[in-house]
Amino acid sequence: MNIDKYSERVRGFLQSAQTFALAENHQQFSPEHVLKVLLDDEQGMAASLIERAGGDAKEARLANDAALAKLPKVSGGNGGLSLTAPLAKVFSTAEDLAKKAGDSFVTVERLLQALAIESSASTSASLKKAGATAQALNQVINDIRKGRTADSANAEQGFDALKKYARDLTEEAREGRLDPVIGRDDEIRRTIQVLSRRTKNNPVLIGEPGVGKTAIAEGLALRIVNGDVPESLKDKKLMALDMGALIAGAKYRGEFEERLKAVLNEVQAENGGIILFIDEMHTLVGAGKADGAMDASNLLKPALARGELHCVGATTLDEYRKHVEKDPALARRFQPVLVDEPNVEDTISILRGLKEKYEQHHKVRISDSALVAAATLSNRYITDRFLPDKAIDLMDEAASRLRMQVDSKPEELDELDRRIIQLKIEREALKQETDQSSVDRLRKLEDELADTEEKADALTARWQAEKQKLGHAADLKKRLDEARNELAIAQRNGQFQRAGELTYGIIPGLEKELAAAEARDSSGAGSMVQEVVTPDNIAHVVSRWTGIPVDKMLEGQREKLLRMEDELAKSVVGQGEAVQAVSKAVRRSRAGLQDPNRPIGSFIFLGPTGVGKTELTKSLARFLFDDETAMVRLDMSEYMEKHSVARLIGAPPGYVGYEEGGALTEAVRRRPYQVVLFDEIEKAHPDVFNVLLQVLDDGRLTDGQGRTVDFKNTIIIMTSNLGSEFMTQMGDNDDVDSVRELVMERVRSHFRPEFLNRIDDIILFHRLRRDEMGAIVEIQLKRLVSLLADRKITLELDEDARSWLANKGYDPAYGARPLKRVIQKSVQDRLAEMILGGEIPDGSRVKVTSGTDRLLFKVKPAKGEAETETADAA
């Protein structure tokens, strides 16, 4: 026996067999040990050969284990193994078989054949008992080999390569394991048309990710199984090549090429009977490429050109351009079939076709209105992905969320269970007490506990019953689906008696039972478990994904929106027109009446400094998101140079920072529903306005990497001081309309008409009047009071002190900012000195009154300390 004549896998098996024999304390190395390791192999080549030869691998394993149990064991020997005569004969027979077949190496299948042939070995009897004869094994080996010989030490990898490195889609379709393919008839017909050509009969499906390229290949497999294809494609097999399995574990140079050649040889040997489907086809280019080695695409080219290899590829537009088009010799061998994104109507049809599979998986029902909502909402709000993939994901996640709720304990029952635990803890504590009040309390508590437990038991029983009903309906759906699959198989195989039983007996019976179960469905009034996915569930998932509030508004939210002006006016004083315009835009959006192709609202706020332009934007962010920082704030003074426009949308290719994206586009892409503030817009370079044109008109902007960013759910606010000099010259009683034309003239001279024409509203903020300063004092003092609250210090200002601050801080040219400085200087600075000096301990009350030209501070400390009085410096 020359070990070099044996393949690497056989050598590995022989090594394992010897180790096993020593572990079992056997002194002799027998054929039974070899058969044992062959049958225990994870890849199961020997077991597969036995099954294909009409035998039972499990039976062979049991018979061989029985033979092994009879072998003598010797404990405490020298640890050596001697070769038995039957095993030596097996090796000799295997070498003879390999020589006759023209093989250079003895492979696993020849070793198994020798174990079946050699009558002196008990393995022959074990295999015969299992139903695998030497003749049957020989026939199976010849079928697998297809005339090929074992010329390398890794020859087994080349046999039955399609089974190892490809999935049979037609077999999966036959067994009903593929999802139904709805629509896409034109693309499938075009694919069949290309496949039916004489040469270059290789279509490549090109389309955006998620439009259904792989589904078209599965649709083709379903059509082949149903016989709904031209004569030239009937009874063909569609095999999906697994590039990962081909590359995985290929350690040595040439091993990958050997595997791929084995796949190609098997496909060619079928004489056009196999169509190869290569998903992510761009992975072929460069796959397996190493120093001097050929990549996969170069190995495929000759077979593709001669028409010996039928192939269907699938890849995205970008990957096709980047990888396949760079190799014209490969590209010309494929015929592109463009797969467009389906429209909303087609997507709804696709969802209706898939609905049953998802209902069966999640064990919930999906309403038709939920499917319509999934298609329409995903199309409108999830702009960076494609239909139907994003709509299917929405439906899937909404059903998954509902199933999770069904499996979780209902809130009502959860509260009762928590109450029971609380009462039990209290009961144990009261048992230790002996006084009368504790005894009375314990009696009451026992009654309450018994009552609560009774309620909880009743609710638990009801919840379990409702869950059981859902489970019953789900089981019926599963049985109905299995019956329909069986009917399709029976019709294909000509088993008309069974088909008749299914069509007129079993299926109608199951349908009737399911209809009755759904009629008693537990999602009626007063039900604890919701089992139907509704549009609200879909809308909730969209809101969680995007942050855009599209789910149904609660009553409180509606009221809040209707009194939005009052809420905003709490922090922005005297600018009723601006507050009203912004509120109306938000209400339009939440009511679903805004133009779906434009931002929610776009405004220019004009007015002198310090009148509340930026403050209104912050208040709006606080109102919508409960966080005034939830906005993109861009100070246009930073965008005064021409090149700074690139910072908004991202640097172009070839420039530093290309991968990082733009300040504006990235912020909106991450959070599509927010306020975008362009502060001091007049300071920006004119090119910035060119970028904003498409944002204001179409609600979209293309960033430096070519991605389209959706601005349809943003509120765009631009602030400017243009024309403010006219407004500061107004009298207290003058109307803002008197200077509107002068201000607009200045605005029109600075901004181009095409920019101004796209703005929803240009709002003038008038200068603050003296009588409005009191309200601003209130707002500023509230902020100061909230800062002092941490120290439990209470601040009170009487009317005179407030009036003193309002008068001292009034400056029509500078708005509310001088008032902020006066409060800082006259109140905050003095308080800071007194706190640090120990005059105001924590928990004190500070009363502020006004003197003739200063504020007086009266401190009432916590109990037990004397009052102090001090005055602010003039």
UniProtKB/Swiss-Prot annotation:
Repeat 1, as annotated region: 6-71
Main location as per UniProt: cytoplasm
Coiled coil spans: 392-526
Residues the entry annotates as binding ATP 2: G607, P608, T609, G610, V611, G612, K613, T614
CDD domains, alphabetized: AAA, RecA-like_ClpB_Hsp104-like
Domain Clp R: 3-147
Location of region: Repeat 2: 83-147
InterPro entries for the chain: AAA+_ATPase (IPR003593), ATPase_AAA_core (IPR003959), Chaperonin_ClpB (IPR017730), Clp_ATPase_C (IPR019489), Clp_N_dom_sf (IPR036628), Clp_R_dom (IPR004176), ClpA/B (IPR001270), ClpA/B_CS1 (IPR018368)
Gene Ontology BP terms: cellular response to heat; protein refolding
Gene3D superfamilies in the cross-refs: 1.10.8.60, Clp, N-terminal domain (1.10.1780.10), P-loop containing nucleotide triphosphate hydrolases (3.40.50.300)
PROSITE patterns: CLP_R (PS51903), CLPAB_1 (PS00870), CLPAB_2 (PS00871)
Region described as Linker: 342-547
Keywords on record: ATP-binding, Chaperone, Coiled coil, Cytoplasm, Nucleotide-binding, Repeat, Stress response
Entry comment, domain topic: The Clp repeat (R) domain probably functions as a substrate-discriminating domain, recruiting aggregated proteins to the ClpB hexamer and/or stabilizing bound proteins. The NBD2 domain is responsible for oligomerization, whereas the NBD1 domain stabilizes the hexamer probably in an ATP-dependent manner. The movement of the coiled-coil domain is essential for ClpB ability to rescue proteins from an aggregated state, probably by pulling apart large aggregated proteins, which are bound between the coiled-coils motifs of adjacent ClpB subunits in the functional hexamer.
Family membership: Belongs to the ClpA/ClpB family.
Annotated function: Part of a stress-induced multi-chaperone system, it is involved in the recovery of the cell from heat-induced damage, in cooperation with DnaK, DnaJ and GrpE. Acts before DnaK, in the processing of protein aggregates. Protein binding stimulates the ATPase activity; ATP hydrolysis unfolds the denatured protein aggregates, which probably helps expose new hydrophobic binding sites on the surface of ClpB-bound aggregates, contributing to the solubilization and refolding of denatured protein aggregates by DnaK.
Assembly and binders: Homohexamer. The oligomerization is ATP-dependent.
Protein name in the entry: Chaperone protein ClpB
Organism: Agrobacterium fabrum (strain C58 / ATCC 33970)
Protein encoded by which gene: clpB
